[in-house]
Design a protein with these regions (language model features):
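Long, non-globular targeting/processing and low-complexity regions
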Residues: 1-8, 15-150
Length: 150
């Protein structure tokens, strides 16, 4: 293995590829925690402006994606008992010190599919839900969700 740049490596093997985001690239949480220790998160809507750069917006985007994927949107159900939501809730709560995530269902969720350059109905294509580091990197790292540009 040979080092090219700081925290970047290259091998002559194509068998394994991975991207590692060092913990020092994760920003301190800016998510607001209410008096009950909860992080209140709403859905991304059709009117949301891109790019999504704030931790709140990226978490909202992730929650909205999971809401659609779980089928809760189509059944008009709460997502509080959804397995993937519970995983995200645990990861974010551990990182922030919150007691959990409370979803605000008052806004109609909606993702402007034409505005997002990398939109895919399968949330797992852009963040591995079961990988704590991937979720934390998505929400607290430098990644952003940007709009599509021709």
């Amino acid at each position: 293995m040979r080092k090219i740049r700081h925290d970047v490596f290259e091998t002559n093997s194509s068998a394994v590829h991975c991207l590692v985001v060092p913990k020092n690239l994760l920003a301190k949480s800016e998510l607001k925690i209410d008096s009950n220790g909860m992080i209140n998160v709403g859905f991304i809507t059709e009117d949301t402006e891109y790019p999504l750069m704030t931790q709140y917006d990226k978490l909202s985007y992730l929650i909205t994606q999971i809401y659609y994927k779980s089928g809760c949107y189509y059944r008009n159900e709460s997502m509080d008992d959804d397995y993937e939501f519970k995983i995200i809730d645990e990861y974010i709560s551990d990182y922030t010190g919150a007691n959990g995530i409370k979803i605000d269902y008052s806004n109609e969720p909606g993702i402007n599919h034409q505005a997002i350059w990398d939109y895919d109905h399968d949330v797992d294509k852009f963040v591995e839900i079961y990988d704590k580091n991937a979720v934390l990197s998505f929400v607290f790292g430098p990644m952003m969700v940007r709009e599509y540009m021709d």
